[in-house]
């Protein structure tokens, strides 16, 4: 697991950092022990995910909902909790946001290592229907200039 970016943070332990943290306003650093698992895993796919993490590191944040239930990244979670104590998660506040962040993670994984077309691809094809349902995510904490009068 040499490709994992991790360091020690006081009060958190060993933190595993994703490479691509696109929507920083939605990131939350959580200890693995504070995240609730709601879905099972499949041994074969877990091995595929483990091999990808060994090759590339952790590419994307996992996704939790407003109740800190893991909604995307179960296989990554199972692999990573043996490598550290905490990581960054996207915090989704609705089903639409869970779907969007989950699709974003798939897209990041597909585009890696060339992320130059990420924003363009988010608004194309099957990704567009997810992005259109959560336009507020793209403007959170963005300063909006007042129009000149």
Tell me what each language-model feature is:
Residues 112-149:
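Alpha-helical interaction elements
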């Amino acid at each position: 697991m040499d490709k994992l970016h991790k360091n020690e943070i006081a009060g958190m332990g060993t933190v595993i950092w994703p490479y691509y943290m696109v929507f920083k306003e939605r990131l939350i650093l959580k200890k693995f022990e504070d995240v609730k698992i709601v879905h099972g895993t499949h041994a074969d796919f877990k091995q595929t995910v483990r091999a990808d993490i060994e090759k590339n590191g952790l590419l994307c944040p996992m996704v939790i909902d407003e109740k800190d239930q893991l909604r995307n990244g179960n296989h990554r979670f199972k692999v990573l909790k043996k490598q550290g104590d905490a990581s960054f998660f996207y915090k989704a506040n609705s089903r639409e946001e869970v779907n969007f962040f989950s699709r974003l993670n798939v897209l990041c994984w597909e585009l890696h290592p060339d992320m130059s077309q990420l924003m363009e691809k988010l608004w194309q094809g099957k990704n567009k229907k997810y992005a259109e349902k959560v336009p507020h995510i793209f403007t959170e904490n963005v300063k909006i200039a007042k129009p000149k009068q």
